[in-house]
Every structure is written in C-alpha cells, then in structure tokens.
C-alpha cells in the first residue's frame, strides 16, 4: 500500500512536563499515558493534564541484567499485559505496563555478533512482534521478529544503515549516523513511519555554533500487505496448494497494483532468498485478490 509520513510535522513545543533522556510514550492497560525516560516515568490521564513522575519496579528473578536498565522500549501483548526490552537485550513483562516488570530471559536476544548495541525498539502488529536494535559503533541496525515476544528470529541483512534517506526524486540526505529509532503504527499495528535522530558527524565533533547539526527526520515505510490464508488445514511440506487472500486497502488495489508473477509465498528463510511457492492462479473476490500458490517449497 502507498504511504506517506502521516505525522511529519512541522511540530512545535507546547509545554515541558519534566526532565528526561531517551523518552518513549505508550498507553498502559488502564489507558493512561506513560512517558518513559531513563531511570523514571511520567504518567497522566490526559496529554494536556498533570503529569506525575515516578519509577518502574523491576524483578530480575535471579537473572543477570545486561548493561543496566536503560533505553527501554515497550509493547502491549495480546492479553493486555506488556513486554519490554532493555538496552542489553533482556525481555521483561508487566501485568499492566505500570506494575512490576519481571525478567524472563537469561541472555540477550540480539544477534550473536560483536556489536555495541543500544536503542532497541519493540512493537507488535496483528501478526507478530518486531524488534530493531542499533549497533552504534558499526552504524548498522538489525531486525528481529517473534511470535511470542520472548523467542526471537534474526532476519538476514540490515534493518537500516547510512544512506537510507532518499527522496522520491532521488535526492539523498547524507547523514553520518542514524539513532533513536521510533515507529508510528497504523490501526493494525504495522509500522508505517520511522522517526530517527540523525547527525552529520561524530557526536563529539558537533561543537556549538559550528556547521554540524543533529535533526529528527521521518521516513515513510512500506507497511506490507494484509494477507489471510484461506486453507483450514495447517501448511506442511506435503501441502499441494495454498490459497491466500490479499486485502484491498485505501490507495492499494491488489488486482491492478501487483506484479503477480513476482509473488512468492513461504517461510522467510525461503522467500528472502528468492525461493518459495510460485503462483498457479488468481481470482478476484470483490476488491480483494485470491492467489493460489503451488505448495512446493513453502519451507
């Protein structure tokens, strides 16, 4: 589906609720607004109301806390509880987003590489959980996905790296480093906009009154497609055909906007490398498109 940055501004400050670093906002189970900052949180019933400062409680449950409890990121789970990832890559859960967070993992969930990880961001859509973490020294980020928010799969390749900010007319923005990623989600939970803190040099070379600068930039994201598997039986290696409905959306007509012959279906480990199931037939269903794939090679 086509998308543009829906919240790209311009913005202006309207009030200061307090001090803090590396904030992230979410809504707790009781629908109150929560602004996390390192070593604390602000809570309010109303964005324009009174904000109360406090601290989260943490229970490591005899597990090692990796790199301290900072740069936290939060997502609501299917049962309305909350999952949190800390800078070190530990996974924590809370009953309602404000009550005690308990650590579930005893090791980091990040890729098994020698990275200097920070600024994780976690979110959930209608299918699964997503996590992106930045290697600040290597200036590269990694993408992970999970069905339960605890056990994660690292997808190959880079989530982002310098050079990703390119306009539709081909003009590129030459930022040295991208950090502090946050995502804006649609009603399905899909990430449709990425917000970055960017800078055009090393941080310690950005001096007062010089020509260097840090900015917040927004980049629209492809949200992916709304897919429904129509078959009632689970997919196995012996499945002969797979029927998938591609749902129409505002600004997207699957019957005209898709190169059907380019479609592949299957496990990410297959499709990401150009393999997977190939299209056999298609049929229109109202505004939607139903695609029948050969089941061979689904992974």
Where are these regions (language model features)?
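Carbohydrate-active catalytic/glycan-binding domains of CAZyme proteins
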Residues: 1-228
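Boundary/junction segments of secreted and surface-exposed precursor proteins
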Residues: 224-245
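Short amphipathic beta-strand and strand-loop transition segments with alternating hydrophobic
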Residues: 74, 230-235, 276-283
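Propeptides and adjacent flexible N-terminal/non-core segments of secreted
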Residues: 99-101, 253-256
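Structured beta-strand segments within beta-sheet-rich domains
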Residues: 271-299
């Amino acid at each position: 589906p086509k998308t543009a940055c829906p919240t790209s501004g311009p913005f202006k400050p309207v009030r200061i609720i307090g001090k803090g670093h590396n904030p992230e906002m979410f809504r707790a189970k009781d629908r109150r607004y929560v602004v996390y900052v390192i070593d604390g949180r602000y809570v309010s019933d109303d964005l324009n109301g009174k904000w109360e400062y406090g601290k989260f409680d943490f229970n490591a449950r005899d597990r090692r806390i990796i790199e301290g409890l900072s740069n936290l990121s939060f997502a609501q789970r299917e049962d309305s509880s909350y999952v949190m990832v800390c800078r070190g890559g530990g996974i924590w859960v809370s009953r309602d987003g404000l009550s005690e967070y308990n650590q579930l993992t005893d090791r980091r969930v990040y890729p098994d590489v020698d990275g200097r990880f920070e600024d994780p961001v976690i979110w959930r859509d209608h299918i699964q959980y997503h996590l992106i973490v930045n290697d600040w020294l290597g200036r590269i980020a990694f993408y992970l996905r999970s069905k339960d928010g605890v056990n994660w799969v690292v997808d190959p390749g880079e989530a982002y790296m310098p050079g990703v900010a390119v306009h539709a007319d081909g003009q590129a923005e030459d930022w040295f480093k991208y950090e502090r990623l946050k995502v804006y989600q649609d009603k399905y939970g899909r990430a449709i906009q990425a917000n970055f803190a960017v800078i055009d040099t090393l941080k310690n070379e950005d001096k007062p009154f010089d020509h260097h600068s840090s900015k917040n930039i927004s980049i629209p994201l492809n949200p992916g497609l709304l897919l429904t598997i129509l078959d009632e039986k689970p997919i196995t290696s012996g499945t002969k055909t797979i029927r998938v409905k591609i749902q129409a959306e505002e600004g997207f007509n699957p019957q005209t906007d898709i190169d059907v012959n380019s479609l592949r279906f299957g496990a990410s480990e297959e499709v990401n490398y150009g393999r997977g199931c190939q299209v056999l037939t298609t049929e229109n269903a109202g505004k939607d498109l139903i695609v029948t794939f050969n089941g061979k090679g689904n992974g």
